[in-house]
């Protein structure tokens, strides 16, 4: 039989539910009916029943132990919370008193200022003075507290403002040196206040560190005790041997008048071991007396059980727990069968509903898909029509653009020919002008000579010159008609060519327009053909899809038929299984009626119970022996604890007597300023203040997410471990 062990020392969270720490009272396989076994003389059933009863008793003991442990945890948490609540109430009362004192002190200060100023100054016409000195409250979290302070602040501000206005008006002009000195005085006063605040904070931290130092010393002492407890068994055996040797040596040394114990410095240890041995002996006497009393009671119970065993009737068998348990199991089986039948019917109805829903859902899905495909096809047709319209417009625009480009090119060629003819004319004109210029100097020379020396020339020379001039004149007259004729011919040819080029350009423009129209008609025909081909493809695709849908529907129909046949087979199998279950239930009822008449099985159960009692007795003896050993060890540890506590008190008094102010300051500096018991090991990133990890976790768990020193908000991510 499993023995309930003591709770382990592994740390576990405080918010553990009872269901998480309980073991299931039954296995997961208990839902199904148990498999049938043939009972041979009733032995197997009795063994199973006894094992079940043992497990149930063990589970009840385990649950009771778990409930008791959880109750102790709740008690400890309750004490801790009550202690914290008392501390919070004390701090709240202190802060309330502090605020009241500040309020009345401010009112008294303003009254004293009024008396001083009214006695020293006369009533003067006040001038408006800038009230830049009025301070504002930098507190964002509490609107009600802010309104409260504003209500208190208004009368104080009015009084102080009136006093400052009087002082400023009576003061007159202020020199810059005086203003500078006043600013220095203000800065010095502010520094003084900051230093005073720092001193107060350091004093508070010093006090917290001293408390943390005390708690740390206690923890060290506890750790030393635990270390002593964790000594091995071999060390304890060696200590017992040393104790036995020391007792023998002590007796011999006392007879001889020597004090070897004092010389070796082990007298105190031997005394403690002697006290431990005395305590163990006393405890053993008490245990022996308790064991004798238990033996007497057990003998009386054994005699009574023997008497009951000899005279057992059938009614007694019927009243036994085993018979009741077997009857309860039989009733549970019948209930399970009925429940399974009801659940089976419900499952069938649910399956039929789900099938109907599936068919309706498939039909709706197919309808939606068909509607969606038709909509998409209509949209595609509209888009195709729009595309053809856009393509035709594009082709028309391209044709117009080509015609315009061709006309522009033809105009450019005609203008180029005209320019060439004009250039030829200009060349000819320049040629003729050059000839005229060539001929003019001869005439000028011939004419200039007679003008210069006309009186000197003779008649023959004059006749020669005149004849020459007449010849030149006749030559020129002969050249001019030819020139005119050539010029006219060139002009006619040029005009004709220009007209031919213009006619050709017009013809080319007409041909390009006709070509663009023919291309447009060709492209339109191609587009119509593409549209028809696309429509044919879509119709073929729709035809193939419809054929696929028809084939799918046929496959679904065949699947439904196969499923219906399988379901009918399952229904037949379930009916047959139901019949078999009913027959089995009847057999079980007959077996249960027969079980009431079987006394032999009860005898075997009694033998099993006797064996179980013997095993329990052996287990109980072992537990008692262990308990006796543990109690003896506890007595030894109590003696050691008394000794260690006395030594602890001595060392503590020595430490406190030898401690200096610097040590106290360091102790207060290291201890947490909130709990005064733990060391500072966590720093807040936002403000830089240092506290212990437990205080920070408690504040986060209680949603008090503000620094205790500066009241600045922080989060779990702002907490960082600090190493001193």
Swiss-Prot record:
EC number of this enzyme: 2.3.2.27
UniProt catalytic activity: S-ubiquitinyl-[E2 ubiquitin-conjugating enzyme]-L-cysteine + [acceptor protein]-L-lysine = [E2 ubiquitin-conjugating enzyme]-L-cysteine + N(6)-ubiquitinyl-[acceptor protein]-L-lysine
Biased composition (Basic and acidic residues): 45-55
Sorted UniProt keywords: Chromatin regulator, Coiled coil, Metal-binding, Nucleus, Transferase, Ubl conjugation pathway, Zinc, Zinc-finger
Recorded coiled-coil stretches: 68-100, 177-656
Main location: nucleus
Zn-finger (RING-type) residues: 672-711
GO cellular component, as recorded: HULC complex; nucleus
InterPro entries per the UniProt record, alphabetical: E3_ubiquit_lig_Bre1, Znf_RING, Znf_RING/FYVE/PHD, Znf_RING_CS
Location of the region described as Disordered in the Swiss-Prot/TrEMBL record: 1-55, 241-265
Localisation: Nucleus
Pathway(s) of this molecule: Protein modification; protein ubiquitination
SMART domains attached to this UniProt entry: RING
Physiological role: E3 ubiquitin-protein ligase that mediates monoubiquitination of histone H2B to form H2BK123ub1. H2BK123ub1 gives a specific tag for epigenetic transcriptional activation and is also a prerequisite for H3K4me and H3K79me formation.
Entry similarity comment: Belongs to the BRE1 family.
Protein name: E3 ubiquitin-protein ligase bre1
Primary gene name: upl-1
């Amino acid at each position: 039989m499993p023995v309930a062990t003591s709770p382990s020392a592994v740390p576990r969270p405080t918010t553990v539910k009872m269901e998480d720490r309980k073991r299931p009272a039954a296995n997961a396989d208990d839902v199904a009916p148990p498999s049938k076994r043939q009972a041979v003389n009733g032995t197997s059933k009795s063994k199973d029943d006894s094992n079940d009863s043992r497990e149930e008793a063990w589970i009840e003991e385990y649950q009771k132990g778990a409930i008791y442990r959880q109750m102790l945890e709740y008690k400890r948490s309750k004490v801790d919370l009550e202690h914290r609540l008392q501390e919070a109430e004390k701090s709240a009362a202190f802060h309330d008193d502090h605020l009241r004192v500040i309020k009345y002190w401010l009112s008294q200060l303003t009254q004293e200022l009024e008396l001083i100023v009214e006695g020293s100054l006369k009533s003067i016409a006040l001038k408006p003075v800038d009230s830049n000195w009025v301070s504002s409250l930098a507190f964002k979290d509490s609107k009600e507290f802010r309104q409260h302070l504003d209500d208190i602040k208004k009368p104080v501000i009015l009084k102080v403002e009136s006093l400052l206005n009087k002082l400023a008006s009576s003061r007159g002009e202020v020199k810059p040196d005086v203003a500078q000195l006043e600013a220095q005085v203000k800065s010095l006063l502010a520094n003084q206040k900051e230093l005073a605040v720092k001193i107060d904070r350091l004093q508070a931290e010093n006090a917290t560190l001293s408390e943390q130092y005390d708690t740390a010393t206690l923890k060290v002492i506890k750790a030393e005790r635990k270390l002593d407890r964790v000594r091995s068994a071999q060390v304890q055996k060696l200590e017992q041997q040393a104790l036995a040797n020391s007792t023998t040596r002590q007796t011999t040394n006392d007879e001889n008048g020597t004090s070897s114990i004092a010389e070796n410095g082990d007298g105190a240890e031997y005394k403690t071991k002697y006290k431990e041995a005395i305590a163990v002996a006393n405890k053993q006497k008490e245990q022996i007396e308790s064991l004798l009393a238990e033996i007497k009671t057990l003998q009386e119970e054994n005699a009574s059980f023997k008497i009951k065993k000899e005279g057992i009737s059938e009614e007694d068998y019927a009243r036994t727990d085993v018979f009741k348990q077997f009857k309860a199991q039989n009733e549970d089986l019948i209930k399970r069968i009925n429940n399974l039948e009801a659940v089976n019917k419900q499952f069938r109805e649910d399956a039929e509903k789900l099938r109907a829903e599936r068919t309706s859902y498939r039909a709706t899905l197919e309808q939606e898909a068909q509607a969606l495909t038709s909509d998409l096809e209509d949209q595609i047709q509209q888009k195709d029509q729009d595309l053809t319209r856009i393509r035709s417009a594009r082709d028309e625009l391209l044709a117009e653009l080509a015609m315009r480009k061709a006309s522009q090119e033809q105009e450019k060629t005609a203008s180029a020919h005209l320019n060439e003819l004009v250039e030829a004319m200009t060349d000819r004109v320049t040629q003729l002008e050059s000839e005229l210029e060539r001929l003019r100097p001869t005439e000028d020379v011939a004419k200039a000579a007679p003008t210069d020396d006309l009186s000197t020339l003779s008649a023959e020379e004059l006749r020669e010159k005149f004849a020459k001039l007449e010849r030149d004149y006749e030559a020129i007259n002969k050249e001019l008609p030819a020139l005119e004729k050539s010029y006219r011919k060139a002009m006619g040819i040029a005009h004709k060519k220009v007209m031919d080029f213009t006619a050709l350009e017009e013809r080319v423009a007409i041909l390009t327009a006709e070509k663009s129209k023919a291309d447009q008609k060709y492209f339109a025909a191609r587009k119509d053909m593409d549209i028809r081909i696309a429509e044919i493809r879509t119709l073929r695709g729709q035809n193939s899809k419809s054929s696929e849908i028809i084939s799918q529907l046929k496959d679904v129909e065949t699947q439904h038929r196969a499923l219906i046949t399988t379901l009918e087979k399952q229904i037949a199998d379930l009916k047959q299984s139901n019949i078999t279950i009913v027959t089995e239930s009847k057999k079980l009822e007959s077996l249960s009626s027969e079980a009431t008449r079987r006394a032999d099985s009860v005898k075997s159960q009694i033998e099993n119970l006797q064996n179980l009692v013997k095993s329990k007795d052996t287990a109980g003896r072992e537990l008692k022996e262990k308990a006796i050993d543990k109690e003896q060890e506890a007595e030894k540890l109590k003696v050691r604890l008394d000794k260690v506590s006395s030594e602890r008190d001595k060392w503590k008094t020595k430490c406190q007597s030898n401690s200096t102010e610097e040590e106290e300051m360091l102790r207060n500096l290291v201890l947490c300023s909130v709990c005064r018991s733990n060391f500072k090991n966590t720093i807040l990133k936002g403000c830089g203040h240092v506290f212990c990890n437990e205080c920070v976790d408690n504040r986060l768990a209680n949603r008090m997410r503000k620094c205790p020193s500066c009241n600045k908000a922080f989060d779990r991510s702002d907490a960082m471990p600090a190493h001193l």
